[in-house]
Regions:
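Extended, low-hydrophobicity, polar/charged segments
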Residues: 1-178
């Protein structure tokens, strides 16, 4: 798998509108990051080499919905954790959830499978998606995620994501223990 050298600035060209917005907001908020460009990485196993290059653990970002497909959640957990729908639902106090259909992911978050990111909230003008953070992610000093593509990954301080970015977009995440 191709992984670029570490880079400390935005890409020269953007492949999606979301990717452009991600780097714009990082610049506006003065949030430092280090990033790499890669071949397409879809699964968590694809991310292992990226983790090594960035010296951190990539988060796993899951797009979930209830049975009626009327509530949507962006669940950010540790990359190595298995997802337990029952434990998630109990911790959040909601009905059982499942993975949202990919069409909803594109419609609500502006991304395809493998590119889900907390930064997708930049496209969620109607606040249709609730960000849910695993307490273990919040307690980690580093946050590794996609830049809204399957070929761009970055490392930032978790506090910059949870406090600075989410406060900037006026979204209050729910933090749960699973």
């Amino acid at each position: 798998m191709y992984i670029s050298d570490l880079q400390y600035s935005s890409p020269a060209m953007f492949t999606t509108e979301l990717q452009r917005k991600v780097y714009e907001v990082l610049e506006i908020l003065k949030i430092p990051f280090v990033r790499v460009s890669t071949d397409a990485a879809i699964s968590m196993s694809d991310c292992k080499l990226i983790d090594e290059k960035l010296d951190m653990q990539m988060v796993k970002t899951l797009f979930l919905t209830n049975a009626q497909k009327s509530r949507f959640y962006l669940f950010v957990t540790c990359g190595q954790k298995a997802f337990d729908s029952k434990a998630f639902s109990q911790a959040l106090g909601c009905s059982r959830v499942s993975f949202a259909p990919t069409g909803f992911m594109k419609e609500k978050m502006g991304v395809t499978v493998g590119a889900a990111t907390v930064f997708s909230k930049l496209l969620d003008d109607v606040d249709a998606v609730q960000v849910v953070l695993d307490k273990d992610v919040v307690s980690n000093p580093w946050y590794g995620c996609s830049d809204g593509t399957t070929t761009g990954y970055m490392k930032l301080r978790t506090l910059d994501v949870v406090e600075t970015f989410l406060n900037h977009i006026k979204h209050v995440p729910k933090v749960i223990t699973v």
